[in-house]
Amino acid sequence: PLLTPWMGRCALVWALLLALCSTPAGAQTRLRAWNVHPEGYPVTEAMKSFAEDVKKSTQGRYQIEVFSNAVLGDQPKAVQMIKGGELDIAEFSMGPLSDVVPGVRVLSLPFLFHDSAHMFRYLDGALGERYAASLKAAGFVVLGWYDGGARSFYCATRKPSSLRDLAGANIRVRSEIFTEMVQLLDAKPIPLAFKDVLEAFEKGSIDCAENNIPSYESTGHYKVAKHVYVTNHVVSPEVLLVSTALWSKLSEPDRAAFQEAGKRSALLMRELWNKRVAQAQEAMGKQGVQFTRVKDVSPFVRRMSPLYAKYMNDPSTREALLTIIANK
């Protein structure tokens, strides 16, 4: 017999009910988040807070597991993983990203920013939005700017107190811009993965490295390199990113939830960072670490002139560099 209108409506209702039953209520999507830092580090703690925020604001539909200590691969590999959609969320310094987004290199220029407050004045505004657009075009969506801290030199075999004390030293570097910086200081750059620095110190294949104080402490580098030359030569950001592959699948409300959680995690990270710097300096002093502050940065700044000239002549970095220098 032919279906009556009433029977047709009943069939439609049953079909809808069956469809609802076949998709479990509150279905979860599990995501992976990566960083290079250890457990308890400000970055890791801020990312865990981000994960909890996302879980709460999406009613548990997105479960994010944070993998610290680069357990899913080193930084260059992780960049390619998130770019290819194999990784969902990650936090990077500018060095590993510079190969795919050359314009971010300017953010690692020596003596560009006075301190973190000066840096975030730009990144929390129009300049940060400009970089976010460049990163999105390369496959990354910015969720928040983290504090990469102020970097200084630390040495095992030398006790530097002036520019000339670094001449001839084997210094670990992480990227091209740091290689150029070290060469301009008449020292020898030694490219090494972050995880290999401690062993290199122990073997004597490097004299010095450079990083921020919390990283110096958390890695145990202070155990073999007890002489810190506080130059604060680079104040640079790190960034929390989500892959465009994931972003394209998110609804507008879920995108808003991720963005708000990212902003909150960035503010938390900066707060945790400032506390960690103070704690690390105090702890290192008790471990016999010697801190020598640079008396005059002008000799260092003058040495960097060729580096600034190079980036001023590069179309991908000129505009951002001019924006920052004009307002220093």
Regions found by a protein language model. Give the residues of each.
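Sec/Tat signal peptide C-region and signal peptidase I cleavage site
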Residues: 23-27
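N-terminal secretory/targeting leader peptides
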Residues: 28-118, 126-127, 133-328
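N-terminal secretory signal peptides that target proteins for export/translocation
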Residues: 1-8
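Bacterial N-terminal signal peptides
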Residues: 9-22
